[in-house]
Regions:
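Catalytic-domain carbohydrate-binding cleft regions of carbohydrate-active enzymes
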Residues: 1-152, 194-196, 201
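Accessory, solvent-exposed terminal regions and/or long lumenal/extracellular loops of proteins
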Residues: 152-215
């Protein structure tokens, strides 16, 4: 995060960190001759804390999707064209990604901006997270303009899908599968094991449901 060499700006670190929330490895380190880039070394630590807190809150979803991808021999992070092969705009989109079955991300990549244009191949739910709070708003299929301030992360939940999120915590030891909530309007199959053994039996699969979920 921030690049292995050089001196990344605060803005670059925050934007890169917001993208890394969804990647398997979320780590910032650097070459010996480059200045340290730990988050606490930058001013305005509250923005960094905001993004890092989202990583912890999304771990139930991310862990579940990583395991499903491994067990199904399918990529977890994919270009839009993988899931929407009949949509020419989705096939041409090279700066947005599917993360698991439920989420599409569209990171802000340009310096000095807080907005960007995104393409949504179906109606979705836009989720904005910042400083401990989630806000949700339905958005229509097609091109949209989103806004994400430094310290905020925006992502999209696919129609009929859901994302489990945990409560704020500062360590994976504090994650509690019994206190999750669902974002979105669908069902979600959660993968949750003991965190220690390699037993992946069916006993570790649970089905979370919202009231508006059929069945």
């Amino acid at each position: 995060i921030g690049g292995f060499a050089g001196c990344p700006s605060r803005e670059l670190m925050l934007r890169w960190l917001a993208f890394a929330v969804f990647t398997p490895l979320m780590r910032n380190h650097c070459a010996k001759d480059s200045p340290p880039r730990e988050c606490y070394r930058f001013r305005g630590r509250r923005d960094f804390e905001s993004i890092l807190s989202l990583r912890y809150r999304l771990l139930p979803y991310l862990y579940s999707e990583y395991m499903k991808a491994a067990l199904r021999y399918q990529p977890m992070i994919r270009p839009l064209g993988f899931d929407f092969p009949g949509d020419s705009r989705a096939r041409q989109c090279d700066d947005q990604l599917l993360v698991g079955d439920s989420v599409i991300i569209a990171p802000i990549l340009k310096k000095g901006t807080v907005t960007r244009r995104v393409y949504l191949p179906e109606d979705m739910l836009q989720v904005t997270y910042g400083h401990g709070a989630f806000s949700e708003a339905p958005v229509k299929r097609g091109f949209q303009v989103i806004r994400a301030e430094l310290g905020q992360v925006v992502f999209f939940i696919r129609e009929g899908k859901a994302v489990p999120v945990g409560t704020a915590c500062g360590s994976t030891d504090e994650l509690d599968a019994s206190s999750l909530r669902l974002l979105g309007g669908g069902c979600y199959e959660l993968y949750w094991d003991d965190g220690e053994t390699k037993d992946v039996g069916e006993k570790y699969l649970r089905l979370l449901r919202q009231e508006n979920c059929p069945g």
